[in-house]
Curated annotation (Swiss-Prot):
<dbReference type="GO" id="GO:0004594">
    <property type="term" value="F:pantothenate kinase activity"/>
</dbReference>
<dbReference type="GO" id="GO:0046872">
    <property type="term" value="F:metal ion binding"/>
</dbReference>
<feature type="binding site">
    <location>
        <begin position="6"/>
        <end position="13"/>
    </location>
    <ligand>
        <name>ATP</name>
    </ligand>
</feature>
<feature type="binding site">
    <location>
        <position position="171"/>
    </location>
    <ligand>
        <name>substrate</name>
    </ligand>
</feature>
<feature type="active site" description="Proton acceptor">
    <location>
        <position position="95"/>
    </location>
</feature>
<dbReference type="GO" id="GO:0005524">
    <property type="term" value="F:ATP binding"/>
</dbReference>
<comment type="subunit">
    <text>Homodimer.</text>
</comment>
<keyword id="KW-0479">Metal-binding</keyword>
<keyword id="KW-0173">Coenzyme A biosynthesis</keyword>
<feature type="binding site">
    <location>
        <position position="86"/>
    </location>
    <ligand>
        <name>substrate</name>
    </ligand>
</feature>
<feature type="binding site">
    <location>
        <position position="116"/>
    </location>
    <ligand>
        <name>K(+)</name>
    </ligand>
</feature>
<dbReference type="InterPro" id="IPR004619">
    <property type="entry name" value="Type_III_PanK"/>
</dbReference>
<dbReference type="GO" id="GO:0015937">
    <property type="term" value="P:coenzyme A biosynthetic process"/>
</dbReference>
<keyword id="KW-0067">ATP-binding</keyword>
<keyword id="KW-0963">Cytoplasm</keyword>
<keyword id="KW-0630">Potassium</keyword>
<comment type="similarity">
    <text>Belongs to the type III pantothenate kinase family.</text>
</comment>
Amino acid sequence: MNLIIDIGNTVAKVALFDRTSMVEVVYDSNQSLDSLEAVCNKYDVRKAIVATVIDLNECVLAQLNKLPVPVLWLDSHTPLPVINLYETPETLGYDRMAAVVAAHDQFPGKDILVIDAGTCITYEFVDSLGQYHGGNISPGLWMRLKALHQFTGRLPLVHAEGRMPDMGKDTETAIRAGVKKGIEYEITGYIAAMKHKYPELLVFLTGGDDFSFDTKLKSVIFADRFLVLKGLNRILNYNNGRI
């Protein structure tokens, strides 16, 4: 079994893979991996990968250093099954690269746009030759809602869920519709622009936020909430024998 530890900005995910098939995923705190010991005792773990976008505290570091299996710590020097053309690989978030790796692994030989809608919204492009060209970073849903409240004098902090007319009928619905529809139009705009350059483009959508697209757009999107975990597992398998 492969142990995949994905430590993000808000939560940590601990997943188990049997070769390429995900068996279980547990959501945990990124400040203390309380589920780690139970997961390791439950499965026959042979190797692990750790990927983090935050600085780990002493508690989490101690837990990870006690793992009784070889551990691959993902960094900018880790060999990857794609060609990384990013000019500053040391600044590239592991989650961005892992999502690209997973998408390319599923559809090698295809031009792919990977959209990850989480704390931030990222747009990544990998071409049919397996070359990762880079991507863009945009504020995520909660970040936009919070910014409107934090950087203005009177706008309230609005929850993402709730009534959302085409045009806001009050301040709350104006903010909700403005932010959520703005994100949807942003995403559809990226897809349209990329498909103009790459007519056979495939699109993957992952991340914690869910958006409603029209039926035509849904037909060109592969939605996969666990794309990053699958990519980390692919990277771990690719480095088998190096750890």
